[in-house]
C-alpha cells in the first residue's frame, strides 16, 4: 500500500515537472516542426546545448542536470 502511494506520488511529480519545464508550451505543436528544421540547419541554436543548471541552483533528484556538479538535496553542489 505504501509502495503504491509512493509510485502514484512519483508519477504525479514527474508529470507536473514535465509540464512546468516544457519549452514553448503556449504554442503547442504549431511551431514544433519549423523549430526542429531550424535546429537541424543550425545545431548551435538548439536549446539542448544550454540546459545545465549552475552551481547552487535548484535541481531535481530524478533529472539532475547540473553543469559540473551533482544534485544533492535539490541543489546543485
Curated annotation (Swiss-Prot):
Gene Ontology MF annotations: ion channel inhibitor activity; toxin activity
Extent of the signal sequence: 1-22
Major subcellular site: secreted
Cysteines engaged in disulfide bonds, as pairs: 52-67, 59-71, 66-76
Spans through the membrane: none
UniProt subcellular location: Secreted
Any single Pfam family the record assigns to this protein: Conotoxin
Keyword terms of this UniProt record: Cleavage on pair of basic residues, Disulfide bond, Ion channel impairing toxin, Knottin, Neurotoxin, Secreted, Signal, Toxin
GO CC terms, sorted: extracellular region
Tissue spec: Expressed by the venom duct.
Propeptide residues according to the Swiss-Prot or TrEMBL record: 23-51
UniProt domain comment: The presence of a 'disulfide through disulfide knot' structurally defines this protein as a knottin. The cysteine framework is VI/VII (C-C-CC-C-C).
Family (UniProt): Belongs to the conotoxin O1 superfamily.
Protein name, per record: Conotoxin Vc6c
Originating organism: Conus victoriae (Queen Victoria cone)
